[in-house]
Curated annotation (Swiss-Prot):
Protein name: Transcription factor ovo-like homolog lin-48
Stored Gene3D superfamilies: Classic Zinc Finger
Any Pfam family the entry gives: zf-C2H2
GO-annotated biological processes: animal organ morphogenesis; epidermal cell differentiation; hindgut morphogenesis; nematode male tail tip morphogenesis; regulation of DNA-templated transcription; regulation of transcription by RNA polymerase II; response to salt stress
SMART domains per record: ZnF_C2H2 (SM00355)
Subcellular location: Nucleus
Annotated gene: lin-48
Keyword annotations: Metal-binding, Nucleus, Repeat, Zinc, Zinc-finger
Chain ranges passing through the membrane: none
Zinc finger (C2H2-type): 133-155, 161-183, 189-212, 228-251
PANTHER family per UniProt: RH12261P-RELATED, ZINC FINGER PROTEIN WITH KRAB AND SCAN DOMAINS
Major site of localization recorded for this protein: nucleus
Organism: Caenorhabditis elegans
Role summary: Transcription factor. Involved in development of the hindgut, the male tail, and the excretory duct cell. Involved in modulating function of excretory duct cells. Plays a role in left/right patterning of cell fates in the hindgut.
Superkingdom of the source species: Eukaryota
Amino acid sequence: MDSRVWLPLIGAHLLPRDISVITQMIANNNNTSISRSSTNSSKPEEKNSKKFLIERFLDDDPSPPASILSPSPKAAIPSPIINPAVEFVNGGYGVKNPLAPLISSFETTSIPCSTVSPSSLISSSKDEFQDSLTCHICGKKFGLQRLLNRHIKCHSDLKRYLCTFCGKGFNDTFDLKRHTRTHTGVRPYKCEQCEKSFTQRCSLESHLRKVHGVTHQYAYKERRSKVFVCEDCGYTDEKFEVYLSHIKVVHPFSAAYLRFTQLQKKNSSMKPEQLSKISL
């Protein structure tokens, strides 16, 4: 039988090797049906129709090739798969370095847990205390222990967080987020005076002050209100519930939403506001 007759009845999503297999099987079924019709002429004439041949082909072969049942690989749409061994950060555009435990061991062996004993803090002056908070690698001084701890991470060759676009490493999620936005083009902070937008809020504030003469209500180094940013499209909102509703509806398969749902299952007693502190 001509393939132009039966191919539309089966479907167009077939590979060339599948067509040759089907052609051979239909040819065999055609010969079988002719021999049966000669032995039993009382059967209806429509039994030799094209539809009957296709039905016989499907009935006689209980296990057709897998490529027939499944669509062509070119037509298949891959579903999002997240490796459980990899922990995503920054909305899925960064991952935690699997070698992060080695980084922690490096810091504990390279940095003393306490550079100054409590007794010496009482007797020593403020200048002596500030001198003690000095990076032993580059000599930079800090006023707070947490600032020294944060600075010392930049000297490590192993980075805690890796960019999923280029593999560049960072030890701070803020630096990772600022970097990945150069790949995605997300500029969530938009100027209301003009059409410019920026990847960081500090850049927007600097633009408003220098270009438009807008003074800010925040003091120097005063903490700003939290803004939740969708790293997929740049949508922003100050309320986590609204932000969560956005990624649930617009980006239901994003790594950010999948990470939140996983944390919600593990911490069912926690409220969404509490989960927002550990999911982002």
